[in-house]
Amino acid sequence: MMLKPSIDTLLDKVPSKYSLVILQAKRAHELESGATPTQAFTSVKPTLQALEEIEAGNVVIHPDPEAKRAAVRARAEAERIAKEEEERKIKEQIAKEKEEEGEKI
């Protein structure tokens, strides 16, 4: 039985079998958690979908793990700031509405 994608094709995309397994496991976990797929799949299982993405070159190992961690932290910080700003605007709107209610009475 021939596996698709073949191990040889996949090993052309990553430096080692170990790296391939780690990349596949992480991407399969992301897909299972609801990450946006990078392509249409022929497979149903997330593990095989991850291999399809690796074969297509849509998923790669980040060359600098520290830079990736810094980018993830920066994105999380930006999301936190955006959320705080949204909450501040909501509070201002509520205060404004309460002030207008006080003037009407």
From Swiss-Prot:
| InterPro entries for this protein | DNA-dir_RNA_pol_omega (IPR003716), Pol_omega/Rpo6/RPB6 (IPR006110), RPB6/omega-like_sf (IPR036161)
Family matches, as Pfam families = RNA_pol_Rpb6
Listed A to Z, the keywords are: DNA-directed RNA polymerase, Nucleotidyltransferase, Transcription, Transferase
The UniProt record lists the EC number as: 2.7.7.6
The protein's GO terms of the molecular function aspect are:
DNA binding; DNA-directed RNA polymerase activity
Q: Which EC class heads this enzyme's classification? A: transferase
Output the SUPFAM superfamilies linked to this UniProt entry.
RPB6/omega subunit-like
Q: Report if keyword Nucleotidyltransferase is assigned.
A: yes
Tell me a GO cellular component: DNA-directed RNA polymerase complex
- Provide the leader sequence positions: none
Catalytic activity reported: RNA(n) + a ribonucleoside 5'-triphosphate = RNA(n+1) + diphosphate
Q: Name one GO biological process term.
A: DNA-templated transcription
**PANTHER family, per the entry:** DNA-DIRECTED RNA POLYMERASE SUBUNIT OMEGA
What task does this protein carry out? Promotes RNA polymerase assembly. Latches the N- and C-terminal regions of the beta' subunit thereby facilitating its interaction with the beta and alpha subunits.
The entry's family comment says: Belongs to the RNA polymerase subunit omega family.
Quote the subunit structure annotation. The RNAP catalytic core consists of 2 alpha, 1 beta, 1 beta' and 1 omega subunit. When a sigma factor is associated with the core the holoenzyme is formed, which can initiate transcription.
Provide the protein name. DNA-directed RNA polymerase subunit omega
Identify the coding gene: rpoZ
